UniProtKB/Swiss-Prot annotation:
Organism field: Streptococcus pyogenes serotype M3 (strain SSI-1)
Name assigned to this protein: Streptolysin O
Chief location: secreted
Region entry Disordered, spans: 30-108
A Pfam family of this chain: Thiol_cytolys_C
Residue interval(s) of motif Conserved undecapeptide: 529-539
Function recorded in the entry: A cholesterol-dependent toxin that causes cytolysis by forming pores in cholesterol containing host membranes. After binding to target membranes, the protein undergoes a major conformation change, leading to its insertion in the host membrane and formation of an oligomeric pore complex. Cholesterol is required for binding to host membranes, membrane insertion and pore formation; cholesterol binding is mediated by a Thr-Leu pair in the C-terminus. Can be reversibly inactivated by oxidation.
Residue ranges crossing the lipid bilayer per the database entry: 260-273, 280-289, 358-367, 375-387
Stretch forming the signal peptide: 1-33
Amino acid sequence: MSNKKTFKKYSRVAGLLTAALIIGNLVTANAESNKQNTASTETTTTNEQPKPESSELTTEKAGQKTDDMLNSNDMIKLAPKEMPLESAEKEEKKSEDKKKSEEDHTEEINDKIYSLNYNELEVLAKNGETIENFVPKEGVKKADKFIVIERKKKNINTTPVDISIIDSVTDRTYPAALQLANKGFTENKPDAVVTKRNPQKIHIDLPGMGDKATVEVNDPTYANVSTAIDNLVNQWHDNYSGGNTLPARTQYTESMVYSKSQIEAALNVNSKILDGTLGIDFKSISKGEKKVMIAAYKQIFYTVSANLPNNPADVFDKSVTFKELQRKGVSNEAPPLFVSNVAYGRTVFVKLETSSKSNDVEAAFSAALKGTDVKTNGKYSDILENSSFTAVVLGGDAAEHNKVVTKDFDVIRNVIKDNATFSRKNPAYPISYTSVFLKNNKIAGVNNRTEYVETTSTEYTSGKINLSHQGAYVAQYEILWDEINYDDKGKEVITKRRWDNNWYSKTSPFSTVIPLGANSRNIRIMARECTGLAWEWWRKVIDERDVKLSKEINVNISGSTLSPYGSITYK
């Protein structure tokens, strides 16, 4: 409160000083005026009463006003007049700004980008999963089944140059866009470099357009480039599509699914897309409960390319400095990239899924995808009859086949064939792009390195041995087999088994059934007959050491002592 009063007091004092200065000037002026009046009135009679000088009256009034102001609580407000900048200074500032905007940093940009020191493979290396511990084998008993789940550590190395486009990155992956070669790029989440640009020429490869297929975009932003591409496409539809058919350009890849990082590297696609659209159950796959194959069909309608620069600075406005690029992330660890082309069309993802434990699943799925008639192959037909199929279409008239789930693979074939022709009703969609290093126009390929566990499951069914002795002799048998299990570390545990009547003499006719568990392996069947000959008392009729487990193993012996006969058949 005291500060406020003090401030008011000093404000009044300042005002009074100003007023005093003005009054002083007035007094001086009046004094001079009075002198002149005195000289001109010397003839005035002396008997008149003298009048008080005007200066004295003015001083009295000023003093009274000063006292009133000092005793007042009102603040005296002073409004200092704003002094404008000198015109010379303004002109100088304007000149400096203009000079700065006209500075040419082309040589600096070229020198700095050419001098960036990096390894293309290292800056775009993507290290996926590293597998340390896993159970190599596991045995699961279910009723009359024994399921062996086998896991093998494998690795995959790929360097794809065409990167799948997802909706969330379309504004960073258009033709002529600038990006950073960093971790975000390897994860399909590129960082954009936004700055003032030089005009950029782009070219669309739709047939029949000739010179009209190339246009220059003055300011190559996402919006401007997209508008230019739309205009080119509309020109083609309006003027050139009548007598021209698009060349068929279909890219097809397939892979069994074992893990997220593995399928990303194998198909060059973000696993989140597949997981979200196709609903891949990675957990069931790792347990060996399901087998899944993914196929990707890329149908390219046209490609838009951006003219590659001769020098790095060609893409920038001359006012852009290297310091500005550094502020936006450019460095040895994240050199700049240039999107050289974008493919437009549609992508069809197909998921084939089964719970079959057959080792022929992959072959059956591949045959179906390639259009092979699998009905003539009993094994393949059985697998496909117990499978489900899902197709998801990205791009084109996706509303018609957004997502199809069926048990009939012919339906999937129709999805792939339908809407494969480019038209206004079936528009193209950005599906993949390629970038180059701005320094030297080398293609930027993501170096995928990942380990994964390949999980396979084999199902075995319990069986039996049917023994039948119809020979004219005394016979003996030896039936041996192993039962396989696995401990918690995946190590194989073998238990030796034998038939209780091994080496017992059996006369004809004789028959019996020996049950075998689903985990039976290394089956050995031996049968011998007594010849009665002193030099060869026992003669082997059957001696098989690697009999395969089957639903029914029929072992038959017959004949005479000198001419015995034996056979093993399977059902």
